[in-house]
């Protein structure tokens, strides 16, 4: 069976496996205080074009989101995101578990617009009883979004300016950041993104690493005791160099972006294969997540030979399904998908 189920169902890049093997006998200090982690941090600072950026390595995406949000916000503050935001839908109430309300607003193509944000904040501040409410303290967005959409240069700059107007911190979830930045729909680079938010993270788990995310405080100083809070949230790895080595490898010779381009190329071909067989594309995603509309009959037949996820049962006759590519996706797998679909054309 071929699989397009997710971008983290393989082990890790061969280059990372090799680097871990080569350094296996080394003895270094723990918790990220090692030369590999320092090298990785320096490479990331160079990549974001900010020598003062503060970089921290955490174990996974949910831990990263909860740690950053809980560390930046006061106890009475909440975080704003769209209704389809990852922290609202797919993180098991983790943010709320640490005492911060997720304030949801409607999105446009799964993106938060400045108009929606401004309207909410104006309405909130106009309410004389707002001191008795959860105070908005942060805006959370994903790049790319849950539906694979990409914020444009203009949208991101405007959103950050709006956040600054209302004294809100902008936090960008970059679990799939590489795929967003190299997509044809993206008209900016990593330094631009870093300059137009307060804090973001560079995803490793979904972009070639065995595990790990790199948090970058680029528009603000890291909160006091952030490192301690990372441990409090269970996101600090004692063998910290395991994360440092991975990001040091990913940011050597632009490997992070090279593998992201490969995934985008594979996703583009998947889309063309579905279109060739007359299958409707559900969302116009330019990234490594592709969404198609299948009939129940085709879904049942295809799922016997291909692994993928149901995204939404839209109706009795339509099932939206997600197909995801990664560094590990092979042309031969796409050939096989094409061949399988021919039988049902």
Which residue stretches match the model-derived regions?
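Conserved N-terminal alpha-helix of the aminotransferase class I/II PLP-enzyme fold
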Residues: 13-61, 83-88, 94
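Active-site C-terminal subdomain of aminotransferase-like
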Residues: 135, 142, 150, 187-286
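PLP-dependent aminotransferase-class I/II
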Residues: 99-137, 141-144, 151-158
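Conserved C-terminal alpha-helix-loop-beta "cap" of PLP-dependent enzymes
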Residues: 75-76, 268-269, 273-343
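General beta-strand structural signal in soluble alpha/beta enzymes
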Residues: 3-6, 55-59, 81-82, 141, ...
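Catalytic PLP-binding core of fold-type I/II PLP enzymes
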Residues: 151-183
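Conserved PLP-anchoring active-site segment centered on the Schiff-base-forming lysine
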Residues: 71-89, 118
């Amino acid at each position: 069976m071929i699989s397009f189920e997710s971008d983290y169902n393989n082990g890790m890049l061969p280059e990372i496996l090799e680097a871990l093997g080569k350094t296996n006998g080394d003895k270094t200090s723990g918790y990220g205080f090692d030369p590999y982690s320092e090298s990785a941090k320096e490479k990331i600072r160079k990549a974001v074009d900010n020598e003062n950026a503060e970089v921290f390595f955490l174990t996974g995406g949910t831990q990263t989101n909860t740690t950053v949000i809980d560390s930046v916000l006061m106890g009475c503050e909440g975080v704003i995101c769209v209704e389809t935001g990852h922290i609202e839908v797919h993180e098991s109430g983790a943010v709320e578990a640490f005492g911060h309300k997720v304030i949801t607003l409607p999105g446009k193509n799964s993106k938060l617009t400045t108009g929606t944000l401004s309207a909410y904040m104006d309405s909130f501040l106009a309410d004389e009883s707002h001191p008795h409410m959860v105070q908005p303290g942060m805006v959370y967005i994903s790049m790319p979004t849950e539906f694979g959409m990409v914020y444009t240069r203009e949208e991101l700059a405007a959103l950050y300016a709006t956040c600054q107007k209302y004294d809100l911190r902008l936090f960008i979830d970059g679990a799939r950041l590489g795929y967003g930045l190299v997509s044809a729909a993206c008209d900016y680079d990593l330094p631009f993104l870093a300059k137009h938010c307060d804090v973001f993270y560079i995803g490793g788990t979904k972009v070639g690493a065995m595990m790990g995310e790199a948090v970058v405080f680029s528009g603000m100083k890291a909160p006091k005791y952030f490192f301690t809070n990372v441990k409090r949230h269970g996101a600090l790895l004692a063998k910290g160099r395991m994360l440092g080595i991975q990001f040091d490898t990913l940011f050597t010779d632009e490997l992070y972006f090279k593998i992201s381009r490969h995934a985008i190329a594979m996703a583009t071909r998947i889309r063309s294969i579905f279109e060739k067989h007359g299958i409707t594309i559900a969302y116009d995603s330019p990234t490594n997540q592709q969404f198609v509309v299948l009939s129940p009959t085709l879904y049942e037949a295809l799922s016997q030979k291909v692994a993928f996820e149901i995204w939404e049962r839209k109706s009795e006759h339509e099932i939206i399904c997600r197909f995801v590519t990664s560094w590990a996706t092979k042309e031969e797998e796409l050939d096989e998908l094409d061949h399988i679909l021919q039988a049902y054309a």
